[in-house]
Amino acid sequence: MIPLILLIIIPSAFFAAIAVFRRYGRILSTVSALAGLALILFIFGSSLISGSAAVISQSYSYIPSLGIQFTLSVSNISLVLLLMASIILLATSLSGNMGLEKETLSSLLIVLFQIGAYGLFISGNFFIFFIFWDIGVIAPFFMINVLGSANRRIASYKFILYELFSSALLLTAIILVYFYSPGHTLNIYSLAGLYSSMPIYIQETIFSLFFIAFMINMPLFPLHTWLPDAHSEASTQGSMMLSGILTKFGGFGMLLIFITMPIARSFSLYIAALATISAFYAAFLMMRQRDIKRIVAHTTIIEMSIIMFSIATMTAIGYEGALYGMLSHGLVVALMFLAAGGIEHMFHERNIGVLKGLSKYSKTTSYVFLIGIFVMSGLPLTTGFVSDLLIFIGGINAFGIYGIVPLFSLILLAGFMYLVINRSFFANKQPTKPSEHLPQAAKAGYAILLLSIFIFGILPFIVLNLVNSSIL
Amino acid sequence: MNVIPAMLSLHLALPLIIAISIIFCSLTLLTNERKMYNAIEVALFGIAAIISFIMLWQSYSGIFLHILQANAFSELLFGSLAFGAMLVLLLTVNAKQQKEMRLLMSLVLFGIFMVSFAYSVLAIIIGLETVIIATVFMILSNGKRYIEPAMKLFILGAISTGLFVAALALLLPYNPSLSITTSLTQGAGRFIIGLSLVLFAAALAVETGAFPFNLWIPDVYDGSPGNITALMAGINKKVAFVAVLEIFIIMFSSYGMYGNGNLVSTVFFVLSIFTMFFGNLIALIQKNVKKMFAYSSISQAGYIFIGISAATKLGIEGSIFYIIAHMLMIIGAFSIVFWLESNNIKNIDEYGGLKDRNPFAAVALTILMLSMAGIPPLIGFAGKFILFSSAVYSNDILLAVIGIINSFISIYYYAKVINQMFQKRMSPRIQMPANIAAVVAICTILVIIIGIYPQILLGPSYLAAAYVI
Amino acid sequence: MDILYLILPLLIGGAASLLLGINENGKRYSKYAAFAGALGSSILTLIALAYPAMLQYGQIAWFTASGSISFPLSFSFGYINQVLLILVGIISPLIFLYSIGYMDEPGEQGRYYVELSLFAASMILLAVSGGFITFFIAWEGLGITSYLLIGFWMQKDAPPYAARKAITTIVIGDIMMLSGILLIWASLNTFNFAAIISAIGAMAAVPISIIVALALIIFGAFTKSAQFPFHEWLSDAMEGPTPVSAFLHSSTMVKAGVFVVIILLPIITHANLLWVLLVFGIITSIVGAFNASGSTHLKKILAYSTIEDLGLMFVALGLNAVSAAVAFFIVQAIYKALLFMNAGSIMKANNDEVDIYQVSSFSRNRLLFAVGIIGAISLAGIFPASGFFGKLLIDSAASSNATVYIILTVLDFVTGFYIFRWLFIPIGHIGKNGSAAIRAKYSALSKAMLVPQVILAAIALLLTILFLYALTSVSIQAAVILTAASLFGILSAYLLFRTSPNNLWERSRSREFLSKGFFVNKAYAYIASGIAAIAIGIESIDGAINRLVYVGAEGILRIGNSMRRTGNGIVNTYVAALAIGLVLLIAILVFVI
C-alpha cells in the first residue's frame, strides 16, 4: 500500500508550485489532478484486485498530548468518492477558467480544494476530518468571492456563514465524541462499536449535531437557502467543485454517521420524511428560477435530498445507492455547471427567458446539457439509472410502498428541465447569437465527464464489486 | 550542548542581557540616531528569547532571592513574549521616536521578565507596572495628539495597580512570604482570602480586558499608534495573562472547592462568557478595522479564560498555547493595520481592493483573520480545539458551546473584511516597508506552520502547564 | 448468434450516418448508411425468426449490488416478442427507405438518422426483452428518441412545444413504470417476466403492493400508448417529420405499452385489474374517434385514429382477448404506417400544407390514391382489407358484453366516417398553388416514398389471406354488423362531403366541440398552473425562511449596536463599569463561599 499521505502531499506541492510559477497555473493544476487521479486509480485497482474489505489506515504522530493521531484511512466509500472527486477536479482544471483572467488564483484554489477534498475523504479521524472540512470550505469561498459573478459578495457571505455554522456544530459534535468515547478516540471507523457505550442522550446529541452540520452542507430543506446563491454566483469552476464535490462532504459524513452510529435508527424515519419533503420542496422551488445556474443549483438540492433519503433507509443497498447517487450526481452536476458556464461565456447571459435557440450556434453544449438532464432523470446506461435503482430498492425495502415516493420528485425535476431546454435550447426560431466561442478546453471537460458518466453507467460493477464486499 | 550553560550560567544570562539592553538603550539616547542601534536592540531581544528557549530545552529550573524562579512555564512564556516584543520593536525601527521606543521597549522586556519569572507576587506587580508605565510613555512620545489615550491607560493602569496592592494587603497575613507557591488553603480567614482573590481578579481583569473591566480597551487601542496597539494587544495583555496564571492557578490552586463550586473557575467562567460575547457582538458592527481588532482581541481573551476556568492541565495547556498563538496573530494583524494607517487607510471600506494594491498584505491578513476565527489548519483552531475540549473535559459543555458560537459569530466580521479586501478596485499599489513585511511574514508563517503541526508549541505548553498545575 | 446482434447493424449504421452527416463530403451518403444498417438488422431479424434455434438468449449478468441483489439483462423470444420483431423488421427498413425520399434537406440528415437508428435499435431491444431491466432500458430509449424526433425541426414554432409535451408525459410514465418495476422487485426479488408471472400466478391473493405496482405499470404503459388522459401528446407529436409519425407514433413505439400489458396480462387478470384496461380503453377510443372526426389536420386525424386504435387494443386486453389484441396489433401497424406515409406524400406535394381543406387531392397520383384507399378501408374495417379481421376479432370478443359491444359498433361507424372524410375532402380540391404545379409535384414524388407504401398495401391485403387461412371460426353476425356500421359511416361521409354543397358537418357546433379535444389540453394547462401556483407558494415560504435568518442576524447586529455605546471615550464610564464588575465579582464570592 502506498502512503496515503501522498494524496495530500502531492497537491500541496503543486499548490506551492503554482504559487511560484504563476504562469503555468492551469497546467500545474491539471497535472495535480491527473497525479491525484492516477494515485487513486492505483489504490482503487489494487483494492479491487485484492478484494480486501478492511479499512486501510495509516497513522502519524500528531498531537500526543491529546492522543490525537494524524490518521488516514481508505474505506470503500472514500475510494468511490475520491475517484469521483478526482475526475471532477480533472475536468475542472482542464476546462479552465472561461473568460476570466484570474487563472492563477483559480488554479491555486482548485488545488487547495483538492487538498481539502482528498484529505476529507481519506481522513481516519474526526479531527483530521474537521481540518479538511474547513479547508474545503475556504477554497470555494474565494471561488465565489473573488471569481464569482454579480452578486458574489452576498452569496459568498451567506456561503461562509452557513458552512462555518455547520462546521461549528461539527466541532461541538467532535469534541463531545472525543470526551465520551471510551479511550478518547476520534477514529471514525473504530468508533463504530463504541458509540453504543455512551449514554443515550449523548448519542442523541452527537447524532443531532452531526446530522444538522452535514444537513447544511448537503443541503436539505430548511437549511438550503445558501446553496442556490453560492452555486450560481461562483465561477464556473467554483460551481463545479461546489456542487460536484463539496456537497458530497455532507453526504460522506452522513454515510459515516448512519453506518457507525446505532442511534441513527431511531431518527431514520423522520429523516427520510424530511428528505422527501426536501426533494419536493426544492423541485417546486426550482420552477421559479430563471437563471440557468440557479436551476442547476436547485437540482443539487433535489438529488442530494434523494441521496439523504437513501442513506436514511439504513439498508446496505440504500447506502450503496447513496454512494452511487453521489458519484452520479457529482459527475452530472459538474457537467451541467460546465455547460451552463459555457453558455454564460458564449452568450453573456444566464436568463433562460432571454436565451433562445442555443442549439443553433452551440450544438455541443446544448446536447451536453440535454444528456445531463437525461442522467438526472435516470436514463438507463448512465449512472443516474443505476443509482435510482439502488436507492429506491433500498427505499422500498425500508419503508415499503412509501419508499417510492421521492422518486416522483424526479417528474417535477425532469418536467421542468425539459421545459427549460425546449424553450431555450431547442427552439431555434429566433436563436440568440453568441458573442464568443466555446473554448476547446471546455469540450475536453465535457468529454471527461461524459465518458465517466457512461463508463460508470454501463459498467456499474466496476464500483459496485468493490462496495459489495463491504460498504465501509 | 553542555557548552552553553558552562560558558554562561544561564540564570545570569537573561538578567544580564536585559541589563545590557537597558544600559545600551540609555546610552544611545545620548548619541545620534543610527540604524545599527536598532539592529543591535532587535538582536538583543532575539538573544533573550533564544536563551530562554535554550533554558527550556535544557529543562533548567531554580529559584533566586525568593523573588524569581525559572521553570518551563516561565521560560516558555518569557521566550515567546520576548520574541513578540522583538517583533513589535522591529515594527518601530523606522519611526521618528525610535530612540525613546528602544529604551521603553527594553523596559517592557524587563517587565516581561519580572512577570514570567516571578516567584514573589511583588515581582508580578513590579513587572506589570513597568510594562504599563513604559507603554504610557511610548504613546506619549508620539506627540500631543496622544495625550488622551496615554492618560486613559495611565488612569486605568493606576486603578489596576491599586486593586492589586489592596489584594496584596489583604493577603499578607495569610501569605507573609508573598511567594506564589505558597498554597492558600481554606482555613481561617477564607473570606478575606476570597476577597483578595476577587480584588486580584478585578485588577488583572482590567489589564487582560475582561468584561466589564475592559471598556477602556477599544478606546485606547484605537487612539494609540498602531505599533503600540500591537504592543498592548500582543504583549501587555499577554503579560497580564501570565500573571493571571501565576496568581490564580499556582497561588490559589488549593484554595479549593466550596459549596457551589470552585471560586476561581466560577469567576473566570463568568468573565469568559461576558468577555467573549461583549467583544464579538460589538466587533460585528465596527466600521473601523483597528477598533474591530480591538474588540476581537477582547473576545479572544475570553477564549483564554475558558482554559483558566477549566483549571485542568489541559485547560492551562490550551491557555498557554492560545496566549502565544494570539500574540502572533494579533501582532501580525496590527502590523498590517499600523502600516495601512500610515497610508491613511482605516475603515473597512477603504480596505477594498487591498488584494490588488498589495496582495501579500491581503493574503497575510486573511490567513491571520481566519486563524483568529478558528479555521483549521491554522494556529487559532488548534488552540481553540484544546480550550473547548478542556471545557468539556471539566463538564462545562455550556462554555464550550458558547465558545463555538462566538467563533462562529466572529466569522461574520472577519469575512466582512476579507470580502472587502478581495474586491476589485482601481487603486495604485502600495508598498510595504521591509521591516513590517518581515514581521507580518514571520507571524503568518508561524501561524501556518504551528497550525499544521501544533505539536511544536503544544509540547512546550504541556511542559509549562505541568509546572503550573 | 447472440440476440443482441440484432441491433448491432442499426447502431453501426446510426453511428456511420452521424459521422458522415458531420462531414461536408459525406453528408450525401448519410442516409444510405442508415438504410443499410436498418436493412441489415431487418435481415438478421428475419433470419432469427426463420431459424430460432440459432439464437442465444437468456440472462446476462449486468451487475450485482449489496452483495446479493443482481440486476440481470434478460431476453426472451416468445410469440409476442416475435410478433413485435416481425413488425419492426418489416416496417423499419421501409421507413428508412421512405425517409430517403422524404427528408431531402442534407444538412440535418446525420442527426435524423442517428436518432431514428437508435429508436429502431431500442424497439428491437424492447421486442426481445425478457425482463424488466432490459425492458426499461429499451423503454427509456424509445422515450428519448421519440422526444428528439418530435422536436426535430427546431426552427419551427410548434415542434419544440410538442416535444416538450411528449417528453413530459413520457417522464411521468417512466417514473410510474420504474416505481412499479421496483415495487414488484421488492415483493418477488426478480426482474424476469416469466419468473414474475409464475410467482404471482402461484399466489392465492395478490398483495396490495403488487396491485399498486401493476397499476403503476399499467398507467406507465398508458403514457406511452397514449391512453386517456395521457393521449394528447400523440396528436402534437405530429409536428415531427412524417416518417417519424409513421414509424414511432402509429406503428411501433406507441405499442410498447400494449406490449408490456400483453406480457403481464396473466397477472393483471389475476390481480383483477382488467377493468382498468377496459374502462380506459373505452374512454380513449371514444375520445380518439370523435377527436378524429373533429380535426382538420391531415396527420392529426390519423393520430387521433391511432389513439382510438390503441384504445381498442386495451379494450380487447381488458376483455382478456389476447389473440384479438395481437391480431389488431399487427394489422393496425401496417395500415397506420401506410396511411401516414400516404399523408406524408400529400404534404410533400403540397409544400407541407396540413389542412385537409387546403391540400390538393392525391387522386392525381393514381398509385398514391390506390394505396390510400387500401389503407382507409383497412382502417374502416372493410373486407378484404386485413383491418377487417382485427376489428372483427375485437368485436366478437366484446359480444358477451352488450354495453361494450354497442360502443364498439358506434366507433366502427365513426371510424368509417372520419377516415373517408379524410379521404374525400381533398379530392378535387384545387389547392392554393394551382393544379399544374401540384400535379408536377405529385408526379415528381420520389420512388423511395412510393415503394414502401406499395409494399405495405400489399402486406395489408396479403394478411387477409393469412387470416382466412388461420381463423377457424368467425361470428358471421359480428362481421355483418361491423361491415354495416363501417359502410354506414362511409356513406355518411360520402353524403356529407362529396354530394352536399354546403358543408353541414364542418360548420356544426359539434365539430367545433370535437376539434377542441374534449378540453384535455385545457386540463393539462390547469394542472400545470396548479403546479406553478404551488411553486409560487413554496417560493414565498423560501423567502420567509431566508427572511427569518436575516431577521436573526439583524437582531444580533442590533444587540452589538446597542452595546457599542459602552466605548464612549469617557473614563468615568470605564471606572463605573469597573466598579460594577467588582461588585459582581464580590457577589460571586458571596454566592460561592
Show the residue positions of the predicted features.
Chain A
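Transmembrane helix-loop-helix hairpins at membrane boundaries of multipass inner-membrane proteins
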Residues: 1-6, 13-108, 189, 468
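Alpha-helical transmembrane segments
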Residues: 8, 12, 30-40, 86-87, ...
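Alpha-helical transmembrane segments and their helix-start/interface "positive-inside/aromatic belt" motifs
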Residues: 23-35, 154-164, 362-366, 442-447
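Hydrophobic alpha-helical membrane-insertion segments
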Residues: 31-47, 163-174, 449-458
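Aromatic-anchored segments of alpha-helical transmembrane domains
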Residues: 38-41, 114-118, 307, 455
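Hydrophobic transmembrane alpha-helices and their helix-loop junctions in integral membrane proteins
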Residues: 93-97, 115-127, 140-389, 393-423, ...
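Short phosphate-coordinating micro-motif centered on Lys-Gly-acidic
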Residues: 134
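Cytoplasmic/organellar membrane-interface segments at the starts of transmembrane helices
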Residues: 362-364, 417-472
